Amino acid sequence: MTTLSPEAFAGHTPMMQQYLRIKADHPDTLVFYRMGDFYELFFEDAEKAARLLDLTLTQRGASAGTPIKMAGVPHHAVEQYLAKLVKMGESVAICEQIGDPATSKGPVERKVVRVVTPGTLTDAALLSDKNDVYLLAMCTGHNKRGVAVNIGLAWLNLASGALRLAEIEPDQLGAALERIRPAEILTADGATDTVPAGAGAIKRVPAWHFDIASGTQRLCDQLDVAGLDGFGAHSLTSACGAAGALLLYAAATQGQQLRHVRSLKVENETEYIGLDPATRRNLELTETLRGTESPTLYSLLDTCCTTMGSRLLRHWLHHPPRASVAAQSRQQAIGALLDAPADASLDALRSALRQIADVERITGRLALLSARPRDLSSLRDTFAALPALRERISAIVANADALTRVDAALAPPAECLDLLTSAIAPEPAAMVRDGGVIARGYDAELDELRDISENCGQFLIDLEARERTRTGIANLRVEYNKVHGFYIEVTRGQTDKVPDDYRRRQTLKNAERYITPELKTFEDKALSAQERALARERALYDGVLQALLPFIPECQRVASALAELDVLAAFAERARTLDWVAPTFTDEIGIEIEQGRHPVVEAQVEQFIANDCRFGAERKLLLITGPNMGGKSTFMRQTALIALMAYVGSYVPAKSACFGPIDRIFTRIGAADDLAGGRSTFMVEMTEAAAILNDATPQSLVLMDEIGRGTSTFDGLALAWAIARHLLAQNGCYTLFATHYFELTQLPAEFPQAANVHLSAVEHGHGIVFLHAVNEGPANQSYGLQVAQLAGVPAPVIRAARKHLAYLEQQSATQNTPQLDLFSAPPAAADELECADAPAVSAIPHPALEKLRDIDPDDLKPRDALDLLYELRTLVRSHDADGHA
């Protein structure tokens, strides 16, 4: 806690002194200071919030001679403002009134109850349903010479309690951050690690937070273990330092323990198929190249019925396991779901899943004691639905280990369900302060208070009837007014019948008003019943939250099983709807895809042409040629996507597919300037190519699209040849190599492991029809002019291009300049060449042909066409008369 000198408070009002003390502890955070029904911001915070949130900036008085600038937001709408600020990367300290204004001398006691930051969100209103939010800490490990040898990472999904550790090479930081996508990154003050732009909001914390010994102990305390050997994290010193800083920061933002962070997973490089940032972008797994969410592989696959399933699916797509065992287990479960009997059909199962709440995030809020009443009622209703869901699963678990495991994990926590059923009203109010949250029968005192509040009128009627009978006073009345409260009124002529326990409260001209001990007791209860009922309900609700804490592990178990079941059911639905098949796996080198289809493109077009793709020990590189728009990039991407889908555990869009081991997928497809990084298109292209050449192994799948096009023709061709040769001779990886350099089609003559394939097209007049079929052998041309015409290039430009193309082809045929051949021996000196005389070909074009080339028939009127015909005849006769052939 920051201590301010007395001089800092001089001249300030007591309330502003209180604010300044709180602000001193949160200097880099906006402080939302509760005052009545508003959260107020002062001074610089007010100016900043007014600018960011478009609030009205006001000025109210002065403190210590300084004008008090203010801006505020209503407490009931605070979440929408928090959401905007968090999206901008800001953090907000929520300062609440915790004292009683009625009993406080001076300012009401206030304190910061939580800090909302981009990486520590748990409120449903601040979270995206289908995206996880991660807080990440990074700690660099150094050797004795002070050289960085690794970077320890720890990242936490506070909404679910999932904590992970990893240690990576320093040059892998960008790829790791692209995979994890943290919302907030903790680094040490003075750290020199360069975090890629846009990777997440950066938060600097004191360097001592990353102390390895303290971090290891803090991690053990959090997990309630003596050591980390059981998690495989005992040797991850840098990661433990990062975890210590992360846990310290997360607990501080919540102002309490992280009760739901009870497990740890260590990720290592060899566990998942490697996907670098370029590959994730180019394959458009969860985001298109234009930055939209659809159409992507994720948007196609995500027919999940729960938000938990959608989030798990996203995680699976970015973490395809290298070992095929996990994929085979998932595909086995998909097959069982597709073959389910009628009474446990896939549709019935998915219908039941649609009724399931977001147990994962509700559990997170429960652990932080911030769960709202409807969270608990949703949790109760979900647990109550589990037995029926398990009945459907039990009918189809045969020969499906994944479903058997899920079924066992879905056993409802009986004690938890009993507590929720007895304590929470069937349809509770949204907030505890509104009342009606605790079920009737759970607490006798609350029921009595409610009865008093709700049945006051009936009690008075009953009391009046009893007192008339007891006293014999027929006109006795029980009434109420705001001045005197409840009373029994007796006319003056009947006062002699008043019992001894009546105490006079007021004398009127014609009547006396009394109160009895019973009525006084009721009055005390009735006048404060509603207020006391709300207070009692708040206390009971807090008690229910505390009583539910021991069930957090069981809730997490159920949430994990529900999410997995939902993803498997979504995979089964996609397989059935889109006619996908189960792939197979082998330990031998190779990829065999028969009639494969691009899953996303197929969903966007009426008809998709399926193609085969085959790799093996003797076939490692496919040189792909053919026209632009012919489907080269689609064919390449579909191969990678089918492979990734297979290892994720999905069925795949093909007639059949078999995969050998795959350790990484690389792509070099398309390029753009990196203006912020000062890199040209060609530099970006070469950087990606360098990463592939340095890291690809014989088990890697590489997609190379038109490498070398960003520089001069000869430079590009030479680079493309050398890169292809290196991929074959050194890396030995599966490579799809698309190119317009037809000289490269000679590569298989030198390397039998290379093969030519091409995308077919048919020329029709000056147009072209793309067949999108992959055939063996090289293409004969690229059809560039036809594609340009399809793109809408003006007709005069196309005509000029055709004219120049004819000239270039004519020059090539008449001159002694052989086409560049990178695969032959270097050419001899010019005087050593023996060249036969080339046949003479007139370089003077026929004037009639020249005239015809400049004509656009669509622009001719009938009369103009006739005149032109006569003109052409004249040109032909004149040309012949001059003795030209």
Swiss-Prot record:
ATP binds at G626, P627, N628, M629, G630, G631, K632, S633. One of its GO terms (molecular function) is mismatched DNA binding. The keyword Ligase does not apply. InterPro entries: DNA_mismatch_repair_MutS (IPR005748), DNA_mismatch_repair_MutS-lik_N (IPR007695), DNA_mismatch_repair_MutS/MSH (IPR017261), DNA_mismatch_repair_MutS_C (IPR000432), DNA_mismatch_repair_MutS_clamp (IPR007861), DNA_mismatch_repair_MutS_core (IPR007696), DNA_mismatch_repair_MutS_N (IPR016151), DNA_mismatch_repair_MutS_sf (IPR036187). Keywords: ATP-binding, DNA damage, DNA repair, DNA-binding, Nucleotide-binding. GO terms for biological process: mismatch repair. The keyword DNA damage applies. GO terms for cellular component: cytosol. This protein is involved in the repair of mismatches in DNA. It is possible that it carries out the mismatch recognition step. This protein has a weak ATPase activity. Belongs to the DNA mismatch repair MutS family. This is DNA mismatch repair protein MutS. The lineage of its organism: Bacteria, Pseudomonadati, Pseudomonadota, Betaproteobacteria, Burkholderiales.
